[in-house]
């Protein structure tokens, strides 16, 4: 594990001021919100007739995008739980609008940060099998995690680093957040948003963020 620790651009690191006791009290006494029924649509199946310029919200931070030259998938999470455990942890209330097997061929997969509700290794491994030529773009510090899972076609980025793919420039930008997948890796990998710019269209996907000077 890298010894490097990252902070936000304003030098904050989102260290929790709550004790474990306070967290557990909140966790087991909080009131669960009522489940909201969201109607899903199968209009996305018409994408084959509209081969470019579309954005489909699949769920949470997962979007299927096409900018006319590339098909892009952001923060792919298709598992039932955002957790390292299959029987515990936050469970999704609503199934993804599109299943992994229903997705079109994917060129680029972006990850904003390593929280389990944004970096789902099980989903990424399946996507690699379905799209062997897809390129994975991840924050600095997360490449090792993907390669350990057999995903080799990975590039990792610091803030403001960029890569151009088929006339689309991908730039990794600062956001106000933090990272961790366990108890001892807080802020050991970076977090950020993706700005995707081509000749015809610009797309920005922030992942998770609070408001900060980064957006001014």
Task: Show the residue positions of the predicted features.
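Metallo-beta-lactamase
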Residues: 1-91, 96-102, 196-207
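Binuclear metal-ion centers of metallo-dependent hydrolases, dominated by the metallo-beta-lactamase
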Residues: 135, 147-166
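Active-site-proximal loop/helix segments of hydrolase catalytic cores
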Residues: 122, 179-216
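Flexible, acidic/histidine-containing loops and adjacent segments that form or flank the divalent-metal
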Residues: 156, 162-183
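Active-site metal-binding motif and surrounding structural segment of the metallo-beta-lactamase
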Residues: 3, 87-138, 153
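Short, polar loop motifs at secondary-structure junctions
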Residues: 59, 139-145, 158-160
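Active-site metal-binding loops of divalent metal-dependent hydrolases
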Residues: 76-78, 114, 175-177, 207-209
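Active-site environment of divalent metal-dependent phosphoester hydrolases
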Residues: 115-119, 143-145, 161-164, 178-180, ...
């Amino acid at each position: 594990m890298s010894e490097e620790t990252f902070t936000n651009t304003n030098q904050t690191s989102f260290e929790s001021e709550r004790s474990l006791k306070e967290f557990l009290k909140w966790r087991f006494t909080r009131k669960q919100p009522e489940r909201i029924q969201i109607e899903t649509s199968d209009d996305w199946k018409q994408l084959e007739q509209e081969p470019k310029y579309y954005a489909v919200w699949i769920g949470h931070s997962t979007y299927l995008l096409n900018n006319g030259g590339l098909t892009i998938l952001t923060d792919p999470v298709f598992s039932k739980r955002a957790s390292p455990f299959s029987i515990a942890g936050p469970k999704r209330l609503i199934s993804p609008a599109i299943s992994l097997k229903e997705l079109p061929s994917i060129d680029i997969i972006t990850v904003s940060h390593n929280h389990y509700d944004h970096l789902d290794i099980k989903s990424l491994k399946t996507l690699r099998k379905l799209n062997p030529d897809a390129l994975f773009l991840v924050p600095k510090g997360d490449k090792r995690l993907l390669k350990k899972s057999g995903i080799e076609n990975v590039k990792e980025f610091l803030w403001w680093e960029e890569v151009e793919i088929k006339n689309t420039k991908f730039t990794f930008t600062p956001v106000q957040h933090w990272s961790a997948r366990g108890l001892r890796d807080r802020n050991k990998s970076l977090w950020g948003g993706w700005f995707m710019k081509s000749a015809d269209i610009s797309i920005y996907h922030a992942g998770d963020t609070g408001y900060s000077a980064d957006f001014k």
